[in-house]
Every structure is written in C-alpha cells, then in structure tokens.
Amino acid sequence: MAASWCIEKRGSIRNDSFRDNDNIPETGCLSIIVLGASGDLAKKKTFPALFNLYRQGFLQSNEVHIFGYARTKISDDDLRSRIRGYLSQGKENEGEVSEFLQLIKYVSGSYDSAEGFTSLDKAISEHEFSKNSTEGSSRRLFYFALPPSVYPSVCRMIKSYCMNKSDLGGWTRTVVEKPFGKDLASSEQLSSQIGELFDEPQIYRIDHYLGKELVQNLLVLRFANRFFLPLWNRDNIDNIQIVFREDFGTEGRGGYFDEYGIIRDIIQNHLLQVLCLVAMEKPVSQKPEHIRDEKVKVLQSMLPIEDEEVVLGQYEGYKDDPTVPNNSNTPTFATMVLRIHNERWEGVPFIMKAGKALNSRKAEIRVQFKDVPGDIFRCQKQGRNEFVIRLQPSEAMYMKLTVKKPGLEMSTVQSELDLSYGQRYQGVVIPEAYERLILDTIRGDQQHFVRRDELKAAWEIFTPLLHRIDNGEVKPIPYKPGSRGPAEADELLQNAGYVQTHGYIWIPPTL
C-alpha cells in the first residue's frame, strides 16, 4: 500500500517541461523503455548496445531498469531468453549477461492502448519509487524500435500516461529511428505530429552513421589539424566521393526495401549526413546547436539535382523476390552528383554512390585533389593525391601520394601514409554506433542527432528526384550482381572529374 500511495503522490506533480541541458541532473533513477522490444531491431541492435553500456559501467544496476514493451504476449523470462542469444557471451561474461537480463521487465500492450501504457507507467513508477529511496531525479528514455506509422499514436500515449512525474526533477526523452517519412510532405507531417507533443530537445532522431568512429572523427580531423585547413576548399580539391557498397542484395527484405529504395534508405540520410560533416564550416564551439547550425547551412546551399547527373540501377534478380512487384521501378543502386553553391565548394562535385549486390562491401570518403601544376616529374598519369577515410569494414585512413621509387633511377611510384585502426589501436574495442548514440541520449547531447530543420532541408534536396522516380520518369538500368554496377555510373564519375588510378590497390598493413 505504501508503494502504491507514493506512486500516486509522485504522479500528482508533473515536470514535463524542457530545461537547459546544462542544468538537468544526469544522476538518479534511469528507466529505459524499448518500444517494439520483440522485434529484430531491438534484439539485434538496441539490447546488445544497452548490454555493452552496462558491462562498461555506463549503466549502473543501482540506477537503471530496462522495460520492454510490445504487442506480443510473453513473460519477462521469455523476452530475456529471446535476447540472450544476441548478447556477446563467453565464459568470462556469463555472469554479466545474467545480471543484465535481470534488469529487464516486459509489459505487453498495443501501441494505441491507454490500458497498456497505464500498465507501463505503473511498472516504471514502481521502479522509480524503489530506486529513489534517497534524493535523486527520475529519467525516462523511450527508444522507438518501431515502424514510423505508429510513432504518432505512441507519442500521444507517452505524453498522456508515461511522462516523468518526479518532483525531484529529471526528464523524458524519445529516440526515433528512420525512415522519417518518404518525402518532404510526409516527413513534415510526421515532424508536426511529434512536435505537437514533445519539444525539439526531447526528440532524438537517430542516424546510426553519425555514431560510427570515423564519422565522429571528421570534425577533429578537419579542425584540429593545421595542414588540412588551407587545403580543404575548391582551390585544391577536385572532387569528393562518399561511397556505400554492399555485396549482398535485399535478402528477404525486398518488400520493405521496395517501398523506399537505395536513395531513401542510404543516400538521403546516412551519406548526406557524412557530406555535411565533410563540407561544413568550422562551428563556433563543440556545442550541439552550433554544429547542427553549420550542417543546415550546407544543406540549404545545395543546388537542385540534375537528371543528367544521376545514374540509377537495379540488380538482375531483384524482382525474383516474391514480395517485390514485377513492375518495380525501385533503384537498388544510385550514383549522383550533388553541388554546393558557396564560396568554399563552388564547382566541386560531391559524388554520392550507394548500391546493393555489388562486387565488394565498403563505405568510405574519398577526397581527390587537383593535379599538380607544372608536373616536372610527369607523374600525374600515375594518379592524383587522395585522402581516403574507410568507415567500414576495418576502420582506417590513408593519404595516397607520389614518392620516388627506391633505386638508382629518378622514377616515381604511388604509395600511401596510412593509419589502420586495427594495427595502431590493438586491443582497443571500437564501440558500436548504437552504444555511442544511446549514451549521448542519456547525457542529453544532441550533436549526433538530426534536428527538424536539418531533416526538412535534406528532404527538400531529394524530393523532386524521388517523385520523378516514383512516377517512372527516371528508370533504373539493370546490372549483374557482383559487378561494379551500371557502366554508366563510371562514365558519370569520369564526367564529374574523378580520375581513377588503374592498378592501384591499397593494402591495409598487417598486425
């Protein structure tokens, strides 16, 4: 009875309003609610990320409790059993896995059910009462491992029944996964529906690419190293490629993928976010709003995408998937040129390339510099200088440059200065993107999350092209699985000014 009375008393005092992050306490009871807890995203990404944060000491068992919520009617132990197989295990951490799983409680309910969310709030409040026997705040983090179609109803339920009620302070935050709409209109509609219920500082639009180690390194590389500052502009850089390649197809996700295609799935969000970090001006400080302000300026400086600077492809066999329509016009491959109309980047093509069922798996940024004027060594035919940042697999960065070939003759050869993370940082475990981003959410750091005006500007760039594709005005070119993609894409790169170094392959240093 005492616990029940205290929960009711706590509920009588509401504290939903946003306050400056610098003044919000980050200690006290923490409730992490995984909505869609029985789904693949939660099992494969969210819960493993939470476990890794727990085992590294970022989630303290005396403060945190994790709640799974979904429509599936299962018990606490059923959910724990489903999750266990996805957590890194070995004899050395069996105990940690068991301890972590005991922090998880499951609540079943629909996503528009007042009864379900009332039960969820009761479970959270009981946890908060038990943890807050001494003075402390209560923090509620809702992670949406859900399709966007249910975001509005879930947000209404949270706002009505599950907001932080502690009279000791704290916060309520929501983490929402992409896709954030299919075009400008649907994205704005979704943003408005969520924005009516939560303030912008309470909304964390997650793009897991912003949590990758070398993506997070971009601003440090650009603004903490003196020699990059005078080179990073149109006077020295000829073109920039941002590439995402997969060597497998849709693999059972054909029906889902066909609704979106490679541009919506990869280019409009992941690769565009990388482009912003590559192209933005130096922010006033490291504060999230200063960084995001500069990213928005880049997006607002972009010119409309021209059809003649776009090549689309669809791998042969894509429509063999029974969930894909026979008349599908959805691209599984795209190469396009984006152009920024500002003083730093006028005339420099940003080449975005993404595709499935290609000949390799990698993601990288390739900055190609201009030819050396007055080439007295006649070495430009060997290739241009390039700075390459390998995002995955095997994180690395290297500078491709021309040196004298060892020997008695004055001849040149291409070589590289490189930094392989696997070699340089042996024994250092590079965190998964979801670990970083969930920790950022708990800390109230929105630097690596997408702001509403940033999202709007991104959709303004791509919506006209996407509508032309949806209407069948732009057709994908068939290409063979395991190839480089359509030959027309290589022609587009050449026309944009990219000079390929034939026969040169960077070999990562061995351990």
UniProtKB/Swiss-Prot annotation:
Keyword NAD: no
Summary of the tissues where the protein is detected: Found in tubers, stolons, roots, and flower buds.
Binding site for NADP(+) 2: 353, 362, 366, 390, 398-400, 418-420, 484, 506
Enzyme class, UniProt record, top EC level: oxidoreductase
Annotated InterPro entries: G6P_DH, G6P_DH_AS, G6P_DH_C, G6P_DH_NAD-bd, NAD(P)-bd_dom_sf
Domain of life of the source: Eukaryota
Main localisation: cytoplasm
Active site, UniProt feature: 270
Gene3D superfamilies: Dihydrodipicolinate Reductase, domain 2 (3.30.360.10), NAD(P)-binding Rossmann-like Domain (3.40.50.720)
Subunit annotation: Homotetramer.
Reaction catalyzed: D-glucose 6-phosphate + NADP(+) = 6-phospho-D-glucono-1,5-lactone + NADPH + H(+)
Molecular functions per Gene Ontology: glucose-6-phosphate dehydrogenase activity; NADP binding
Assigned keywords, A-Z: Carbohydrate metabolism, Cytoplasm, Glucose metabolism, NADP, Oxidoreductase
Its job: Catalyzes the rate-limiting step of the oxidative pentose-phosphate pathway, which represents a route for the dissimilation of carbohydrates besides glycolysis. The main function of this enzyme is to generate NADPH for reductive biosyntheses.
Record EC number: 1.1.1.49
Subcellular location as annotated: Cytoplasm
Residues given in the record as NADP(+) 1 binding sites: 36-43, 71, 151, 178
Family indicated by similarity: Belongs to the glucose-6-phosphate dehydrogenase family.
Amino acids binding D-glucose 6-phosphate: 178, 208-212, 246, 265, 356, 361, 392
Protein name: Glucose-6-phosphate 1-dehydrogenase, cytoplasmic isoform
Pathway involvement of the protein, from the record: Carbohydrate degradation; pentose phosphate pathway; D-ribulose 5-phosphate from D-glucose 6-phosphate (oxidative stage): step 1/3
